[in-house]
Amino acid sequence: MKYPIAVDNNLATWNAYTNDYWPAEYLIDAQGVIRHVAYGEGDYGADESLIRTLLTAANPTEKLPPPTNVAYRTPTQETSPESYLGYTYASESYLVGGSLSDNVVATYQSPSNIPVGNFAMSGQWYAGPQEITAVSKSVININFQANDVYLVMSGDGTITETLNGKPYKTVAVSGYPRLYTLFTNKNDVSGLLGLSFTKGLEAYDFTFG
């Protein structure tokens, strides 16, 4: 990135806007007036056009570079919703088979039937405000509909994956929280991913593409 990135670790900006969504876009003009608000993915061409309009309004003599020409890759098919794993956003989670036990190690049991777009936990997990931490025989089963499945994780260890009950792949996890690709496909498909975590791995957030 060749431009400044603002970090909001303490959620000061998030809370100042009483925001409940991610991603959320707030376009603000040169006078500090909020001119546009949008939630969720997509419609990036319209966003860019609005940004260019506000920049020109602020400085009509400034010559802007040509508009970007990037292929539109936002899925148009039905896609599983993003799901946070910590207890802070448990009300917005798509966990089935029981609720999280906050700030303690608890044993979970995955139901045999998981609706599309939902996930279930089994084994022992510690549930924190932003993440869940694998303790023993820790598994997440997620029934997805998407081209791609991603999970934000941290720690050092591995995830062993199954796809529709068959061995799929192993993902090595290392270091600070970042996005890992669990599944990718050219077309939108549904499937059941089984994710077995080694002890100490932390999982934060499922996203889909």
Question: What do these predicted ranges mean?
Answer:
Residues 1-3, 7-50, 184:
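Thiol/disulfide oxidoreductase modules built on the thioredoxin-like
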